Amino acid sequence: MIAGLVVGFIFLSTDNSSVVTNWIKPWGTIFIRLLKLIAIPLVFVSLVKGISAMTDLKRLSTLGLKTISLYLATTFFAVSLGMGAVSLVRPGSVFSKSESEFYKQKLSSETVLNVPQKERQPMDYIVEMVPDNLFSAAGDNSNMLQIIFVALLVGVAIVVLGTEKTSAFVSVINATEAIILKIIDFIMQFAPVGVFALLAALVVDFSGDSAMFSALGMYAATVVVCLLFLAYVFYPVLLKIFTRNNIGDYLKAIFPIQLLAFSTSSSSATLPFTMEQVQQKLGISEETASFVLPLGATVNMDGTSCYQAIVVLFIAQIFGIELTIAQYLTVLFLTVLASIGTAGVPGASVVMTVMVMSSVGIPVEGLALILGIDRPLDMLRTVVNVTGDTFVATLVDKK
């Protein structure tokens, strides 16, 4: 990250910015394309797997219903918090309309917004969610809602049919997800090169424009404040209200979990330690821990959802895109849904953000603005993700 900034300033100061534009920036473009490439496969298989995993709810109906309800409620609040904060602070509203259009073209000359060409009818948004051709829908990131619709159908069908009839297909889905996650791992190994190129290009493209760097600082501050509020105010206060647990004891018990989550940036990697810690330090039963926490590592990503909402609206503000009420609701719906489909591994949330942005017509290339500072924010949102899991597990067990 620092190297990209340094190289950008060096070439800028020596009046050789064309070197960055012609030879370095394309590597950043390749990185963005790789993220777009893997978005649709990840969304489909992750949602199918996440929904099909809920077949256990038939056996644990009371526990399952309570757990899912709490997960959805906290995720909805996290998304609403992120959308509300970024709409109030408006960190991306730093340019005039002409400047926003200019910078949008700088980031991508190929970007075409999904601006309606004719007056839309009230039911058009619902009609467009249903694809008439699966393959054409899969070939365009802007049709992500159609992919989600198909994934929901497949996932629900698996739940209704039961594991006996669908075990072979579920095995294929699990294997496919493993392959996709490995591909994401490959892409993330290329991330240092991509981020280096994007930041070097960012310095050249926005040279002399302190407003952009001020906007990025405000964006990062908005994300951090929202995430800290969730982890250290929202969850502990609710826990105190509903269980009478001591907030200090709770935070002390989960601190080692948060530390590991911050270090690994992976909810899945933290899961075994989380299960052990909540049983030993919080007194949660093995039955509750073994059901609620693995499910949470799959379907509960409050930190990620809050972050995605902030990113989408921030980039829309940077580009001067005014979202309609329907688009705001789409962002709300998709970010909540994305918490089911985001894999608990480093970098997966960025790929899912591509899905949300594509669905409301925001140029995915705008991610280039925030990827350079994403790593520390990824570590922090993983802390919130696992904290949300421990909160729900404690609440379910005590109630």
Give the positions of each predicted feature.
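Anchoring transmembrane alpha helix of integral membrane proteins
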Residues: 1-47, 53-56
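Juxtamembrane helix-boundary/capping and inter-helix hinge elements in multi-pass membrane proteins
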Residues: 50-59, 94-95, 161-167, 175-178, ...
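Signature of multi-pass transmembrane helix bundles
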Residues: 5-13, 20, 32-35, 66-73, ...
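Membrane-interface alpha-helices at helix entry/exit sites of multi-pass transporters
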Residues: 59-66, 182-186, 281-296, 325-327, ...
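Transmembrane alpha-helical segments and their short flanking loops
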Residues: 309-399
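Membrane-water interface of transmembrane alpha-helices in multipass transporters/channels
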Residues: 16-23, 61, 209-217, 244-255, ...
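Transmembrane helix boundary and interhelical junction motifs in multipass membrane proteins
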Residues: 39-43, 194-195, 266-274, 288, ...
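Helix-loop-helix junctions within the multi-pass membrane cores of secondary transporters/permeases
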Residues: 257-339, 393
